[in-house]
Amino acid sequence: MNQWEELQESVGFDFQNVELLQQAFTHSSYVNEHRRENVKDNERLEFLGDAVLELTVSDYLFNKYPDMAEGHMTKMRAAIVCEPSLVEFAEAVHFSKYVRLGKGEEKAGGRTRPALLADVFESFIGALYLDNGIDKVVKFLERVIFPKIDAGAYLQTVDYKTQLQEIVQRDRDVLIEYDILGETGPAHNKAFDAQVIVNGQVLGKGSGRTKKQAEQSAAQFAINQLTHR
């Protein structure tokens, strides 16, 4: 089994055009050193993969969070498709071992360079889309990205207090108040408890290491209550 057969087995998809898969993992430095081989670098596939990734992640967020405001979905998507996240995804599926680099780039540590790994992940998405279609891209993301979204890995990018305000004020003017109920623990490791009150009714309680975190936690609880009635 060669490395490209191994890679296809690893990702769970067979490529009709294996050259497309190889191109996705070909850095421009490799092309510069192998001009006689008529190989192409992955930059065009990266361009396409970036767009496909934005679309598929946007679609997933749109359906998973039906009450989330556009601004919050935009922030969450940005956190998912940013370079550090893409590097994490690429490392999870061991993409670095398959990258084709020029000797100079290899010596310079290119195989572990974050920007390069992020680009490779996007170019793979582009190649997978061209060869297998959007449905197979979604299946791949269901293994690599969507479980992290489901686990709440990117919810810290969301301002729950603002989101709660947008939800409850859609149809009427309301008064939203936050109360700090108390604090526990020693001075160096305190925890605060908070509650959110909407028009005199307690909708949520939460705790956190700071007063702001406790209020955000209370707002998140209130949102869950409102959206799962």
UniProtKB/Swiss-Prot annotation:
The gene is rnc. Residues 159-228 form the DRBM domain. Its EC number is 3.1.26.3. Its cofactor is Mg(2+). This is Ribonuclease 3. Homodimer. Digests double-stranded RNA. Involved in the processing of primary rRNA transcript to yield the immediate precursors to the large and small rRNAs (23S and 16S). Processes some mRNAs, and tRNAs when they are encoded in the rRNA operon. Processes pre-crRNA and tracrRNA of type II CRISPR loci if present in the organism. It is found in: Cytoplasm. It comes from Listeria innocua serovar 6a (strain ATCC BAA-680 / CLIP 11262).
